[in-house]
Amino acid sequence: MRGEQHRLTIIGDVGVDLVLGPISGWPRVGTETLVERSELRAGGSAANAALAVSYLGGHSQLLSAVGNDEPGAWLDGQLRTLGASLSVCDAPTTLSVGLIHSCGERTFFTTRGHLDAFSYEMLRPRLPPAAPGNSIALLSGVFLTPVLRASYSLLIRELHSLGYRVALDTNWPPQDWTGALRAEVATWVSASDHLLLNELEVRSLADMADLDAAIARLTPMLKRGATLAVKTGARGAIGAQDGERCECAAPQAIIFDTVGAGDSFNAGYLLARLDGAGLAESLAAGCRSASAIIARFPRRAIAAGGLSALRARLPLGALEPV
């Protein structure tokens, strides 16, 4: 497994997450609300993906940063075992509170913190050449790292020059989607090898309400051989590559905490790609991984390798072509 450690590199946002819930409705200003469940954990899209890789028995190197405070030191300790290489920013560590609603949706309150200072200049000295063969770099949380975002096109070019295939998960922009933002993201999309977005992000990036129409608009933006994986929540995922389109249903599960669902999908999907799986099989792996991981609470109860059986190859007869 040692050689696998450098086949998947994860670059993006990490922070301290406090997940609380469930709540029904929104509390009246000035009141206190008691909730039944909580967990303090390493979070952020990049950390969630790295943790999911570990649960699945895989290895990755996580490149990010923490702040120069006690939460940053705690976060560093949580992530070191995942192969993390973390710069230290002269800023407080980014904190996020995730409120879980009774309907299953979630609301986040996030401080800007150290992620505002994380830069390409901090990252580049820690970025090694890709391992020979099939190596992937996953980029996530771009909108929470504004300084790094300014060098995103440069970063993608550098990753390709180092031998990586690039997977991109933009996440949702706090400033919402605008024409200028769509044009900026389009330059990253056209240079990426795997585009991993959820249904709302696909419709927003394409500026179309209908998902099928949005997929049809985005696929011509992909370079030859690149894939689009659309995460459709409890329904599963849709994939498109070079004119092929397929759909995979997600396993049914009782879910309390959906935080990190998309990141867990990314981990399963990319590990399957690294294992040589095709589009349909990789979508299935992503759906299995996400359903299994978000069904567990607290997440700290999942041991490294505890879900490694999910990486077993499935017969293609279990997949639904479209």
Residues covered by each model-derived region:
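Structural alpha-helical scaffold elements that stabilize or flank donor/cofactor-binding regions
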Residues: 129-130, 187-188, 221
